[in-house]
Amino acid sequence: MKKINLAVVGATGMVGRTFLKVLEERQLPIENFYVMASSRSAGSKLTFNGKEYTVEELTEHSFDKPIDIALFSAGGGTSEKFAPIAAAHGCIVIDNSSQWRMDPEVPLVVPEVNPEDIAWHKNIIANPNCSTIQAIVALKPLDDKYKIKRVVYSTYQAVSGAGVAGWKDLENGLKGEAPKKFPHPIANNCLPHIDSFLDNGYTKEEMKMVNETRKILHNDNMRVTATTVRVPVFDCHSESINIEFEKPFEMDELLETLKNAPGVVLQNNSEANEYPLAVDAAGHDEVFIGRVRRDESVESGVNIWVVADNIRKGAATNAVQIAEEIVKNMQ
């Protein structure tokens, strides 16, 4: 692979630091490496591949130097302002915020699912929402084989999805302290409220899952609904997914399809109490699937339980995988 110049924007945040860890693990070939953040974090030090780097302040001139790929995880406002600047300088931006996801000019990519969409980028590629990424890895092989008619998501999302502040709310809440990030205590509680409420009664998080599922699977007519819930778990999102197919299926064949799907680990042995758990998925890049059973209330439906590390596969690793695909195709 060609060596590239790479920047991480939002390098001091939870996902930003995980970018560095995943880049080290996967050994993307890097010539020059830059870490950038807001003025608040500028001047701090980060270590990457055994070398210390000084965090630069992100400005309009940050991309005057040659940078091939920039991994952004600094929020929608930062991406809205700086991603077009980077793109105009010839840098390919892989953005982890929601800013560009539903832009028809911007590919929304999960490499195990739709890597071909990378080809039509205009120097900005969107990383999907964390809860969508793990779901789509599970849905894609089933959609290819049985044609999905309808999806019902129920999520159990870790506090790390709300960043360091969400993590601290749970940590401090277990000591009896009042929440600062969430509207109610998260310790010993479940909050059916992720992101803000919309006029249709759904939250933004729920509609992200609906709209992103359709875009990634290239099916605007797919019936999708979601209820997203924040739970008192530090890391890893869990999801109950009910899927209805257009075609009939045999359970043995469906299980084999999941077992052979890219990025999937099937843990489906109820007799041995084997099923995906957040504590086991933490630190891994795979999507874990279990509790697979026929939905007996419809003609052709299945229930599955899906767990993944939301900061790794749900954010940092997915973005780095996109970068790997880009580098493979560089001359």
For the regions a protein language model found, what residue spans apply to each?
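Charged docking surfaces used in two-component/phosphorelay signaling
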Residues: 70, 159-331
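N-terminal Rossmann-like NAD(P) cofactor-binding subdomain of oxidoreductases
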Residues: 1-186, 222-223, 287-288, 292-298, ...
